[in-house]
Amino acid sequence: MTQKISTEKEAVLDAETRMREDARSRRVVLVCHCLLDGNAKVWERARYSGDFTAVTDIIQKKGYGILQLPCPELLYFGANRYWGGKNVFDSAGFRRFCREKARETADYIENYNKVGVKAVCVLGCDGSPTCGVSHTNFYDNGGGRPKTLMRRVIPGKGIFMEELEKELKERNLPVPDFVGLGMDLFSDSTEAIVEEFRKYMEGK
């Protein structure tokens, strides 16, 4: 009996030691779904075959966790969806769906926040109608008979990013930096985009 109690005490002490030696960084980066899976991109918009390794390597070298955000477009419109601008996608139903996904994402941040895990940033995809951060897109001639659409890049967040920021503010949670990689702008090279992100992460 004495031996059993001694073994149980040793097990408790061993567990406490492991907890003290916990290696987690207490830092996490929330990453736009398609940056971790190019298969989620709308057709003809993927610049990489799988994940955007050059970007994920930067995050992993810092020792930070990566939380993959949902892709509202893929879930709502499907994998074989047409290209679309923010003005085309911004229906009451799709915005409500984005808000639901924003609430789920905010739950992660809220739970992390309670135990001291910091969301370093939200990494979006500039030029996306849903996950753009500083720039989204707009189609002047959307709707009606199928045709070639005239695409414009305009300042502002995509629908999901708007709803996520709004949800965090409504919960009085810390709002992390929203950082946009210009992967859907096609004005900068992939190398330039990666270098800009690398410099940003140096200070994080």
Give residue spans per PLM region.
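Active-site and ligand/interface coordination hotspots across diverse enzymes
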Residues: 1-45
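Divalent-metal-activated hydrolytic enzyme cores
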Residues: 7-10, 15, 24, 62, ...
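A structural signal for short, well-ordered beta-strand segments and their strand-loop junctions
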Residues: 30, 66-70, 118-125, 177-182
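Short loop/turn segments at strand-loop or loop-helix junctions that form parts
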Residues: 32-35, 70-73, 125-129, 135-136
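Short catalytic/ligand-binding loop motif for oxyanion handling, primarily in non-cytosolic enzymes
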Residues: 38-39, 76-78, 128-134, 186-189
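Glycine- and acidic-residue-enriched helix-capping/strand-helix junction motifs
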Residues: 41-52, 145-157
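Short, surface-exposed acidic-centric catalytic microdomains
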Residues: 45-89
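Internal, conserved structured core segments that host functional sites
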Residues: 121-142, 149
